[in-house]
Amino acid sequence: MHASLTRQTVPWEAVIAIDGADPTRLPAPLAADPRVRTVVTPQRVGAACARNLALNTVRTEFCNWADDDDEFEDHAMATRLHILKETGVGWCAGYSQDLHPDGSTSLWTCPAPPGRHEAGDVWTYWKHPSDTIPIGPTTILARTDLVRAAPMGGLVQGEDYMALGVTNLAPGILLPIPVYRYRKHPGQMTKQATYDQLEAASREHAWNYGRSLSAALRSGEALAHG
């Protein structure tokens, strides 16, 4: 991840959430980079909690969740930042690619179609909890205030599904180009033997959250307009 960040063409900062681990194990290139800061929890609290605590320290106008074993495309930040600045939407996303051990990639085209989406529209492309999520959470660059309003939730896995909540809070644009590479390897969480035990429940919780959030916001708008 860090190597891909160094190839970005716009300024950036990174906050690394270290979940109860020894911070001295941080690789030397990251520890030496002044653009990288860490938030260390004194005990293991889980990815969702650790990431939410790290979010407290974000200083940039826009924010993008990411996993340390994945990569951004070289143009990812500049392309989406340009859209955000030019259009004034709250978020901008793209497609992702699976990065396989042999270095090859395969494109994942998300269910939501490319183009502009009004607040709440993206969730309509997630018809059932077991269906494919409508947009890749780590492909979304969004205003930091929106990310703080719809963060990672408290799930022990699938916490990134909750991050899709930002699409209910403001209009956004989905670009039909890959911006993120999701590295496939045996050590990833989704490959662990226990992963399936909570996957269905995590999906259902996130799905209900998004639908309820969208409904509540639309109800509030209706009341405001009489």
Each language-model region and where it sits:
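Conserved donor NDP-sugar-binding/catalytic core segment of glycosyltransferases
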Residues: M77-W108
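Catalytic core of nucleotide-sugar-dependent glycosyltransferases
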Residues: G120, Y182-H185, K191-G220
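Glycine-rich, basic loop-to-helix element that forms the pyrophosphate-binding segment
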Residues: T41-V58
